[in-house]
Amino acid sequence: MSNTANTGAFEGHKKLERNVTLLAALTLGVVAIGGIVEIAPLFWIDNTIEKVEGMRPYTPLEQAGRDIYIREGCYVCHSQMIRPFRDEVERYGHYSLAAESMYDHPFQWGSKRTGPDLARVGNKYSDAWHVQHLKAPRSVVPESIMPNYSFLAEAPLKVPDVAANLTALRHVGVPYSDKDIAAAKTDLEAQANPEADAGDLAARYPKAQIRDFDGDPKRVTEMDALVAYLQMLGTMVDVNSAAAQEELSGKPQAGEKGK
């Protein structure tokens, strides 16, 4: 009886596999149902990313640095996503919040780490350390396999149309104001030159760090932009008082109980 039932089921499935039209229709139906189950709930959610106080769009200089970061492939070896595991929190700091990537296009979470995670590297090291590390990585981290990026200190920062970059980002949801866009070129140059008139740059971009980043105040280089970007990472949101941090630090992970 069992063998007969199994044979019947097999024959029925064989007919389904041989009928391309029926198989395609059923496959489409299953995919459609799965898509509805995944997508439908989003229509009842006001925002999939919870807003966090302190988040702001990148300054033009930070954005230029981020573009260089992507251009040079830094994201291939460095993630920007600290997972909510005790070992990662103890090494890198508070786990990453979704809101911290809300203005990233594309995001820089990363899927592997050849080097350390950089989500909270901002203000962890001095500008001089970053410059030296980028010029000659093994002079500060002997075991590093990172290539040298000394050419960044010699390359003048060239952004053909800063305002157009910010305008494009505004089209995909980054809330740059008309004033931000109009002052983009001035803001980019002023942030790396402490002697320049930065106007209301600090007011429009809270916590923006205004100084010479590469040690050469006479010009703005690609090194200035990249270091400005690195020094900003993880500094916008105050996570020191987050209850989740205390909870994570106080509870044993799976497998630790009883040790």
Segments and roles (model prediction):
Residues 72-76, 81, 114-117, 145:
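Short pre-active-site segment immediately N-terminal to redox-active cysteine/selenocysteine motifs
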Residues 81, 148-152, 231:
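A mature extracytoplasmic/lumenal domain signature
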Residues 65, 71-80, 130, 226, ...:
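The canonical Cys-X-X-Cys-His
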Residues 77, 143-149, 237-246:
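Surface-exposed patches in mature extracellular/periplasmic domains of secreted proteins
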Residues 1-58, 194-199, 203-204, 229-259:
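Post-cleavage N-terminal segment of exported redox proteins
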Residues 23-32, 90-222, 259:
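Electron-transfer interface patches adjacent to heme c in soluble/periplasmic c-type cytochromes
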Residues 41-64, 79, 94-108:
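Sequence context of c-type cytochrome heme-c attachment sites
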Residues 46-70, 82-85, 89, 114, ...:
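Electrostatic cytochrome c docking/interface patches
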